[in-house]
Amino acid sequence: FFFFYLAKSLENATNFWPDWDYKTDTYSQSTKIKTSEVKKIEKTFNQTTDSFLKEKYWFLTMKAYFYSENQNNAIAFFNTTSSTIEKGISYYRAFSYVAGINYTQNKIALSNYQYAVVFENCPMLRKEAILNFKPQETKDFNESLKMVKNNEEKAALWALYGYYADPVEAISKIYT
């Protein structure tokens, strides 16, 4: 029940979405989770030995950092702990948080690459990846292409590009 208590404690920050405003800039008005609160959740993650609960506390920690006063802590936490987590929906949702933070920091190429990885590896999050992928400049897309590690990531990146820009070119690049 402690997990539910911690998850519920985040709702003021995570469920902020004024029904009268569809613009995302109102996010800055939402309640931010205090770093001290996130540290309590992280401590629980570190102390948990059950693998199922550990994954749940890991994701809860990521979510709390994402909605916290300092989102950079989410990236640091992900980079130091993600290798211990199975690459399932929790992992890729957390990775999409990292991609979102990179987007807000104007790291467009990195963010787009990360959303392509989510798109490729987690079908349940494909809609989220499509909606958050933002091909803005050709140079950003070319930078994203330089980051791919295999043909699957390359195909995912081109598929997302094709959704927003030139589907014929994207298909030709996927199959060549």
Region spans (language model):
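N-terminal alpha-helical interaction modules that lie
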Residues: 1-33, 118-119, 123, 132, ...
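Extended alpha-helical scaffold segments
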Residues: 14-15, 136-140, 169, 176
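Helix-turn-helix repeat elements of alpha-solenoid scaffolds
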Residues: 26-41, 66-79, 105-107, 131-137, ...
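Alpha-solenoid helical-repeat scaffolds
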Residues: 33-51, 55-56, 60-61, 66
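Solenoid-like repeat scaffolds
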Residues: 42-52, 78-89, 114-124, 141-150, ...
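"A position-specific structural signal for the A-helix of alpha-solenoid helical repeats
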Residues: 55-62, 93-101, 153-160
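Alpha-helical linker/edge segments of TPR/alpha-solenoid repeat scaffolds
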Residues: 70-71, 100-114, 127, 133-155
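Repeat-solenoid scaffold signature
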Residues: 89-112, 116-117, 166-171
